[in-house]
Design a protein with these regions (language model features):
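Metal-dependent C-N hydrolase catalytic cores
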Residues: 1-42, 198-206, 210, 216-220, ...
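Short, functional N-terminal and low-complexity linear motifs
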Residues: 1-5, 25-26, 65-69, 130-135, ...
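Generic structural signal for short, solvent-exposed loop/turn connectors between secondary structure elements
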Residues: 2-4, 80-87, 186-188
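Short amphipathic alpha-helical segments, especially helix-boundary/capping motifs
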Residues: 7-13, 31-37, 73-76, 139-143, ...
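Active-site histidine-anchored catalytic micro-motif
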Residues: 17-125, 207
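Conformational coupling and interaction surfaces
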Residues: 90-100, 105, 109-225
Length: 225
């Protein structure tokens, strides 16, 4: 997939070389500059930005050019539900200042938490073998990297986290959300709450069967095209 998609060429050198060194200090990168250019380009409606890792590039773009706040919608997978005892999670904890900026700056945000939300998107080797293996080069690739994640597949399932964001874009009914006041990410990586803050959308669950059904049907259609 990477070899056949020109946009990925040189990707390792395009992204930020470090996390935000301090709150309010961006990291210049080709990725951040590219996002700014795309956001400010003429179009109807907002640009949907889907970071599925730490928020460094998006936060840097916002700090470098705050005008993009009015031109984008961020759909971010990271952290935990706003009522969870801890906000800490891999994507969020890598760059806390960048994560905090997403919730503080007022950018339109669809927050997809990991625990008990994206976490529902589990599949198994038998299901992948039945519905991905043999469905063209992409299906075989997905099956092989899934099986290669670990050697012991007994009583095992794995979360496919990243498809939660695209699922919301495809059909928001698959990833229900509600409006809530943007939480405050504390220095201890917990959530604090203030009802005077702006609103964000928080996802509350994922319709696992609908999302995987859509994925598997599209793999089959692509393979037979």
């Amino acid at each position: 997939i990477c070899r056949k998609t020109p946009w990925w060429s040189g990707m390792a050198s395009c992204v930020a070389a470090s996390y935000l060194p301090a709150p309010g200090e961006p990291v210049r990168s080709e990725a951040a500059e590219h996002l700014i250019g795309r956001a400010l380009a003429g179009r109807e409606g907002p640009l949907y930005v889907v970071p599925i890792g730490c928020a460094t590039n998006v936060a840097s773009a916002i700090l470098l050019e705050p005008r993009i706040i009015e031109r984008i919608v961020v759909v971010w997978l990271g952290g935990n539900p706003h009522t969870w005892p801890s906000a800490s999670e891999f994507n969020l904890m890598q760059d806390p200042p960048a994560s905090r900026l997403l919730f503080d700056c007022g950018v339109p945000l669809v927050h997809i938490p990991c625990r008990n939300v994206a976490e529902h998107l589990r599949t198994t080797v038998p299901e992948m073998e039945r519905h991905a293996k043999g469905q063209g080069a992409i299906g075989d690739y997905l099956f092989n990297i899934f099986c290669g994640y670990r050697t012991d597949h007994f009583a095992w399932s794995k979360v496919i986290w990243d498809i939660s964001t695209i699922a919301w874009l495809l059909d928001s009914r698959w990833v229900p959300t509600h409006l809530t006041h943007s939480p405050i990410l504390t220095s201890e990586l917990t959530w604090s709450h203030d009802a005077s803050r702006h609103f964000v959308r928080e996802a509350t669950t994922c319709n696992r069967d609908a999302i995987f059904g859509d994925l598997f049907r599209k793999l089959e259609r692509h393979a037979s095209a």
